[in-house]
Amino acid sequence: MKVIILNGPMGVGKTTVGKYIADHHPGTAFIDGDWCLDIHPFVGNQETKAMAVDNILHMIGNYQKCSVCSMVVLVWLMDEPWVIQKITQGLSAMQAEVKNVTLVCSRENLIRRWKDDHNCEWRTDEWLNVSLKSLPGFASMENIIDTSDLSVEQVAELVMQ
C-alpha cells in the first residue's frame, strides 16, 4: 500500500490537496490526523499526540486489509520530529510505500488563505499567529513543496510525482 503524508502549517492547504488527491485516485482513503485527536477542549501534548499516532496507524492498518483500498493520504500538522518518526516507523513495519511531503507557502499567501477560509473553526487571529510563527520550522524540513503560486491541481501533481 502507498501512503502519502502531507505535513505543514495550519492553513497551507494540506486538507484541500489531500482531498483532491483522494478524489482523483480511486481506491484512496483520506485521513485527517485531527480526527484522531479530537478532544474537547483541544489538548496537544505528548500523550495525546502519541495516542493520535496510534490511532492513525490503526486506521491505516485497517485500510491496508481492505481489498478496495490501495492508497492512503494522511494530512496532519507534524511539527515535532518524533511524531513523523513514529508514523514512518509504523508504516515501515506495515511494509507500506511512504512518501512524506511538507507543504509551505509565503507569509502573504498563508494570511490570504486563512482569511478566505470561512469553514474551519480554527481560523482565528490567535491560531493565524501560531501558524505564521511555525513557517520557518516547516521550511527547514525535507521534501518541501512551496504552494504559494500553485493551484491545488499543480500541488497534487507535484506530490504524486
Where are these regions (language model features)?
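Pre-Walker A (Motif I) flank of P-loop NTPase domains
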Residues: 1-3
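Hydrophobic anchor at the beta1->P-loop junction of P-loop NTPases
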Residues: 6
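Walker A (P-loop) phosphate-binding loop of P-loop NTPases
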Residues: 11
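Conserved lysine of the Walker
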Residues: 14
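Conserved substrate/cofactor phosphate-moiety recognition/catalytic segment
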Residues: 18-61
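Glycine-rich phosphate-binding loop used to anchor ATP phosphates in small-molecule kinases
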Residues: 51-94
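Conserved phosphate-donor/acceptor-positioning beta-strand/loop module used by diverse small-molecule
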Residues: 94-114
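Small-molecule kinase domains that catalyze NTP-dependent phosphoryl transfer to phosphate-bearing small molecules
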Residues: 116-158
